[in-house]
UniProtKB/Swiss-Prot annotation:
Function, as annotated: Involved in the modulation of the specificity of the ClpAP-mediated ATP-dependent protein degradation.
Pfam families, per database record: ClpS
Secretion signal span: none
Domain of life: Bacteria
Family of the protein in this entry: Belongs to the ClpS family.
Quaternary structure and partners: Binds to the N-terminal domain of the chaperone ClpA.
UniProt-recorded name of the protein: ATP-dependent Clp protease adapter protein ClpS
Entries under InterPro entries matching the protein: ClpS, ClpS_core, Ribosomal_bL12_C/ClpS-like
Gene Ontology biological process terms, A to Z: protein catabolic process; proteolysis
Length: 103
């Protein structure tokens, strides 16, 4: 018995499948008047693994523009990062908001 997925002649079957790369989602921090700059930098370095200089640059963008991109990920990872930020902010008493948007 010939199985289509094991037959050497079926290579074209696999190449005909049109796969799209997964959509990308940006994780953004939103500015508020209470969360400290130090806490934002800590989140950026520990949750998003940004270098100190990058974290400071994103923190300043959040502070001056009201919103800053922390990174782009697949949907599941972006939502996990958002959850980590929100839980940590809540635990430490900060009103920091984090959103996920398709980019």
């Amino acid at each position: 018995m010939n199985h289509p997925n094991t037959d050497h002649q079926s290579d074209t079957l696999l190449s005909d499948i049109n796969t799209q790369p997964p959509k990308r989602y940006g994780v953004f921090l939103l500015n508020d008047d209470y969360t400290t700059m130090e806490f934002v930098v800590e989140i950026l370095t520990e949750v998003f693994m940004l270098a100190q200089e990058q974290a400071v640059a994103v923190m300043l963008l959040v502070h001056h523009e009201g919103k800053g991109l922390c990174g782009t990920y697949t949907r599941d990872i972006a939502q996990t990062k958002q959850h980590q930020v929100m839980e940590r902010a809540k635990t430490e008493g900060h009103p920091l908001k984090c959103i996920v948007e398709e980019v």
